[in-house]
Amino acid sequence: MFNINIVREVLINLNLIFMTDPIADYLTRLRNAIQAKHRVVEVPASNLKKEITKILFEKGYILNYKFVEDGPQGTIKVALKYDAVNKVNAIKSLQRVSTPGMRKYTGYKDMPRVINGLGIAILSTSKGVMTDKEAAAEKIGGEVLCYVY
């Protein structure tokens, strides 16, 4: 019998299955790995996913990450961060905001506050992918990709 996850990965890597929202897929893979208490999760790479992963690392939500150049697009290995005592993950919630069917944009004056400033919003701006606080400091708005807290 075939493992359906392995078959799906092979088809995705061969570009035989088209994903309508790769960012939602990325966030879902992270959520599933957190729920299953996995230490490492491997996801197909893209430039946008690399930038989101970099922000998650810089803000302390993940332990480490590594880009692996294998195949046509490569993969990202993300080491999830857990509390040593309680075994609780640093990421409480990953929420996709802007979707391909419903884009959400914000100006720098109307920047969303995630959990009263305790979380972050990740935005795609004209100057690259950055957090809500960085975008407000640069006085630029953009597409709200996701909330993390």
Where are these regions (language model features)?
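Core subunits and conserved enzymes of cellular information-processing
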Residues: 2-149
